[in-house]
Amino acid sequence: MHASAHRPFYSLFLENSMKTFFFFTYVSLAAMLSLGAQTAMAQVPAKAAACLACHGENGNSSMPNTPSLAGQNARYLYLQLRDFQEGRRDNAMMSAMTAGLSKADMQELAKYFSEQKLTNKRFNADPEKVKKGIAKANETLCAMCHLGEFKGQNEIPKVAGQNFDYVVKTLKDFKAKDRNNDAGNMTSVASTLSEEDIDNLAHYIASLN
């Protein structure tokens, strides 16, 4: 019998996921280099290069469920990397990617992505949903932590202009308590949101520049 038959499913899943990740990392980096991006890549910290396959060039993700990191608060980015490494956020891929990072590595990555410019994705938001999203944001006092227009501060993330699908996923994860590395603040807020509220908020947030 093949040896893999005796291995746990999660072990095989993680191994296959990592193989797929590294394949697409290689393809993505090769594509960027082939398009004449050698100079830009030379400015990317070595440990940040692997992040680009999912989070996009300069941290601008084109993958709906993967967040853009460009322009994000450095303090927030550092804390999330640390939470992935220490198991406070549950994501097999990110846990594997952060496993070997030192504190200095995580700070360097956070600084690099915080200094990149978030590009305008020109999200085609529904005006009526945006209006309702604004009303819900005011009702739930989002600006008390995220500040006006969701620009964030320190360990509170900037979410303005974030990918629509990722915003929806994040709010649903907090509501379902699948994510809980926020000292309970977002879990408490998200528990009051309906599916419609989440959709409206995501339209509003994704429409912000």
Residue ranges with predicted function:
Residues 40-60, 121, 125-148, 163:
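Sequence/structural segment immediately N-terminal to covalent heme-attachment motifs in c-type
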Residues 60-61, 115-128, 149-157, 175-183, ...:
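Inter-heme linker and motif-flanking segments adjacent to c-type heme-binding CXXCH motifs
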Residues 99-121, 165, 191-209:
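C-terminal capping alpha-helices of c-type cytochrome domains
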Residues 59-89, 95-101, 138, 150-176, ...:
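Gly/Gly-Pro-rich "capping" loops immediately C-terminal to redox-active cysteine motifs
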Residues 30-40:
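C-terminal segment of classical bacterial N-terminal signal peptides
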Residues 16-27:
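Bacterial N-terminal signal peptides that target proteins for export
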